[in-house]
Amino acid sequence: MDINKMTYAVQSALQQAVELSQQHKLQNIEIEAILSAALNESESLYKSILERANIEVDQLNKAYEDKLNTYASVEGDNIQYGQYISQQANQLITKAESYMKEYEDEYISMEHILRSAMDIDQTTKHYINNKVEVIKEIIKKVRGGNHVTSQNPEVNYKALAKYGRDLVEEVRQGKMDPVIGRDEEIRNTIRILSRKTKNNPVLIGEPGVGKTAIVEGLAQRIVKKDVPESLLDKTVFELDLSALVAGAKYRGEFEERLKAVLKEVKESDGRIILFIDEIHMLVGAGKTDGAMDAGNMLKPMLARGELHCIGATTLNEYREYIEKDSALERRFQKVAVSEPDVEDTISILRGLKERYEVYHGVRIQDRALVAAAELSDRYITDRFLPDKAIDLVDQACATIRTEMGSNPTELDQVNRRVMQLEIEESALKNESDNASKQRLQELQEELANEKEKQAALQSRVESEKEKIANLQEKRAQLDESRQALEDAQTNNNLEKAAELQYGTIPQLEKELRELEDNFQDEQGEDTDRMIREVVTDEEIGDIVSQWTGIPVSKLVETEREKLLHLSDILHKRVVGQDKAVDLVSDAVVRARAGIKDPNRPIGSFLFLGPTGVGKTELAKSLAASLFDSEKHMIRIDMSEYMEKHAVSRLIGAPPGYIGHDEGGQLTEAVRRNPYSVILLDEVEKAHTDVFNVLLQILDEGRLTDSKGRSVDFKNTIIIMTSNIGSQVLLENVKETGEITESTEKAVMTSLNAYFKPEILNRMDDIVLFKPLSIDDMSMIVDKILTQLNIRLLEQRISIEVSDDAKAWLGQEAYEPQYGARPLKRFVQRQIETPLARMMIKEGFPEGTTIKVNLNSDNNLTFNVEKIHE
């Protein structure tokens, strides 16, 4: 018995048989151990053939186990179990060897073991009974005229069924969504497939534009017989490259599998069209030391026209892998698949609408489809139509479906209230005092009312759920009937087609309309319903907002109020800069109302003014107002960009340089948060060439990073701050704080000397911040003290500062050329430091209020006023 003359599957079965013998404490390897191991082998051909012959495999395996248990086990020390082969097991191998010679094979394979077992083993004979000829016929079909010339012959049997899926068969079974449009690309593909040689189209396009859908569309046309005669009998197989590579343990096994697939395709005489998605993976697939990769194995067959192949890949991967191998590239004909426009996407969504309605059991409004196409095109810029629009619709449907499965909020609240009252009732029943009895009586009345309300709501919910279930069932029946009609028309079953088209389908459509009308009449408007089963444009807007962070959904009342009073909110934080606050808040309101220019940022402003007047503070307060956190502000300190080459930090290092994979500080931040406030602080400190990057952002609302990706800035507010002309402002401002026209001109002259005209011309507004007045300082004192009180609140301590003390603080710290920053430092010295010393020295108890007053010597006094009990 030469183990090298056996296939890997037979070798593995013998190894398993040794382990079985050891488990049963048998010195010999019995025939049943070998056959049981063969039956339990993963992807067992032995088992597969018996199953196809309708033999009870589980019972046969149990019979092998029972027979093994009848052999006498040997106990003792130093006994080597499973070291010898029994006489009957030896006969099995010898007979299998004779079958190997009969089949003209080079290795003993599983089918030889099965034929041998049918002749020698009584248990196998009993179960196979009179199916010997059937099994012989199945073995013949499985082998398909092949000979066992390798130790892994199983890969050659039904290779296409193992490593691919029949798209034409899936269309016939109704498993595939309809393909709408793409007629020109499908026709182009058909034209290339009809050539004599090099009849291999490769579909090239961005991810998500519908390359795979074109092949599915071809499969659907083949089923409908809507193709030229030369393609009528064709079938399309999608090759699963990962399945080909997976589990290839031995050298050359991958090549063997691929050869088996290609052989089947070749033997079909052009009937099989092979579709390889992500065809670039073929280049280098399976390549080890000295081995040939899959791409090179395909070349001869592709050139001779023996292999009909459709490939699909993206532009980048085609350039990176296929174009490098010019011999492989010339064997394919390119078909460019462009991204459909919004109108075509809406048509595609309308075609898919019914499938999604049936699958999710919801109703999709047409305006939801239009919104999905338009909003995805406008806001989801890093993906492609129609894929991103289909994803939006699918997600919105899933959201509504999830809501339908749970209780509505109104019923949920009543259920919680009833539970709460029942708990209180059971507690009060144990009390005997009059107050508890009185409360119990009131509570029982309230509980009765709530339970009545609960029953009414529950009944209404059940009724709506039942009606929705009926609608879903009717839609599913209609979908099945339409699928059956397509099958009947394809198979030329005219009688059945006529019955479905003129009888069943119109009747189902009528019943569905009646159900929908009744549901509409009974429930009234959508807003009156307990359960929503309609997907509207609002749901689509919500999903876009979830994905991008950009507020697209309709304004709720609280947000509407917040926007209308945005300037008031900003005024509370930014003192004395009315014009700047109004300009920024107006830009946000325009954007949220949906009337801003869709191709530019929400707003781009240059804030000019002395230090400490609120330029940066306005940007921070805007971020806090819009996003409830200053963290949503992208702050870039332009003093870090003083060198010319520093621009690469904004958009990313060029290819070949360290940090290329990390992307740019600005571009990556905006890609992650497309709706944000960008603050470019102290812009005059940056090198002038850095501003050239800003030209496209300010004008077109986009910027291309170092990797060639376009980053969308259309939903950002860009604020630049600068101190240019601050000296002119300080010297020439009126006592009232107003900026004169001559001062404004002088500042603009300074500005033009520094910035190029093309930068200034693209700004929405250049805002001059006026120096702070003494009145503004007293308001800022209040702000600083409020923030101090918030910090003290954590320690349950509060501070009260008298008006005299506040006025003194504002006056003493007033330095027009430095703005509000000296005031902050002055408050730290005069209030925070003495207070901190007192807290450490005396340790105030919780609830302490400290009063700060100004004495006659113009010094602040601290008094511990009261302690709250």
UniProtKB/Swiss-Prot annotation:
> Per UniProt, what is one Pfam family of this protein?
AAA_2
Q: Where is this region: NBD1?
A: 158-339
Give the record's GO biological process terms: cellular response to heat; protein refolding
| Residue ranges, annotated region (Repeat 2) | 85-145
An example of a Gene Ontology cellular component annotation for this protein is: cytoplasm
- For this protein, what is any one GO molecular function term? ATP binding
* Compartments, as annotated in UniProt: Cytoplasm
What are the binding positions for ATP 2 in this chain? Answer: G609, P610, T611, G612, V613, G614, K615, T616
**Which InterPro entries does this chain map to?**
AAA+_ATPase, ATPase_AAA_core, Chaperonin_ClpB, Clp_ATPase_C, Clp_N_dom_sf, Clp_R_dom, ClpA/B, ClpA/B_CS1
Positions of region (C-terminal): 772-869
Clp R domain location is 3-145
- Please list the coiled coil stretches: 390-524
List of residues binding ATP 1: G205, E206, P207, G208, V209, G210, K211, T212
Which family does the UniProt entry place this protein in? Belongs to the ClpA/ClpB family.
Could you describe the subunit structure of this protein? Homohexamer. The oligomerization is ATP-dependent.
- Per its UniProt record, what PANTHER family does this chain match? ATP-DEPENDENT CLP PROTEASE, HEAT SHOCK PROTEIN 104
Function recorded in the entry: Part of a stress-induced multi-chaperone system, it is involved in the recovery of the cell from heat-induced damage, in cooperation with DnaK, DnaJ and GrpE. Acts before DnaK, in the processing of protein aggregates. Protein binding stimulates the ATPase activity; ATP hydrolysis unfolds the denatured protein aggregates, which probably helps expose new hydrophobic binding sites on the surface of ClpB-bound aggregates, contributing to the solubilization and refolding of denatured protein aggregates by DnaK.
Q: What's noted about domains in the record?
A: The Clp repeat (R) domain probably functions as a substrate-discriminating domain, recruiting aggregated proteins to the ClpB hexamer and/or stabilizing bound proteins. The NBD2 domain is responsible for oligomerization, whereas the NBD1 domain stabilizes the hexamer probably in an ATP-dependent manner. The movement of the coiled-coil domain is essential for ClpB ability to rescue proteins from an aggregated state, probably by pulling apart large aggregated proteins, which are bound between the coiled-coils motifs of adjacent ClpB subunits in the functional hexamer.
Give the protein name, as stated in the record.
Answer: Chaperone protein ClpB
Q: Give the species this sequence originates from.
A: Staphylococcus aureus (strain MW2)
